[in-house]
């Protein structure tokens, strides 16, 4: 099985909260696609609650689009990581890590403005596979933690696993 890009970086050295360009690619027509690792918490040290990350999934996707989409950027998808330490965001365009970090912080401010759980988008059995597994309170706790900590940048060159380490795994 091929080694995926996300497993060539040293998770023991990742900062969080932090933005990382996980991958750059181009479509056959030359459009730039960028995948970002939006690391909410340090791998193997902390984890996002299942209800909190699920509620963030519903809120974060729309709020990030509000703050980042524009003439040169269009978000394709924002999905939670299976390890529950963050989200991957795929988009058309090449915004800077700082632009993404600023949009992320603004989106977290938006999460704090949601007053009632009933305001969570698509919170029903027709549009959500586990619509009862949500917690606005937990999502807002996560948002407060991100705002308090600020968002830094993780760079692939700083996190790259050596061929020797990869060969021994």
From Swiss-Prot:
**Record: residues binding Fe cation:** 54, 58, 128
Cofactor names from the entry are:
Fe cation
Q: Which InterPro entries match?
A: LuxS_sf, Metalloenz_LuxS/M16, S-ribosylhomocysteinase
- Supply one GO BP term: quorum sensing
Q: What is its EC number?
A: 4.4.1.21
Family named by the database record: Belongs to the LuxS family.
Its quaternary organisation is: Homodimer.
Q: Please give the name of this protein.
A: S-ribosylhomocysteine lyase
């Amino acid at each position: 099985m091929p080694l995926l890009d996300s497993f060539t970086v040293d998770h023991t050295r990742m900062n969080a909260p932090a933005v990382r360009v996980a991958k750059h690619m181009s479509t056959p027509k030359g459009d730039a696609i960028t995948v970002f690792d939006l690391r909410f918490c340090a791998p193997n040290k902390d984890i996002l609650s299942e209800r909190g990350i699920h509620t963030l999934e519903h809120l974060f996707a729309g709020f990030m689009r509000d703050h980042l989409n524009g003439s040169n950027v269009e978000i394709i998808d924002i999905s939670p990581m299976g390890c529950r330490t963050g989200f991957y965001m795929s988009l058309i365009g090449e915004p800077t890590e700082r632009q993404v970090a600023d949009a992320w912080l603004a989106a977290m401010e938006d999460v704090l403005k949601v007053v009632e759980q009933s305001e969570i988008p698509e919170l029903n059995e027709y549009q959500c596979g586990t619509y009862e597994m949500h917690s606005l309170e937990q999502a807002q706790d996560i948002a407060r933690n991100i705002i308090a900590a600020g968002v830094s940048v993780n760079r692939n060159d700083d996190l790259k696993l050596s061929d020797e380490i990869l060969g021994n795994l």
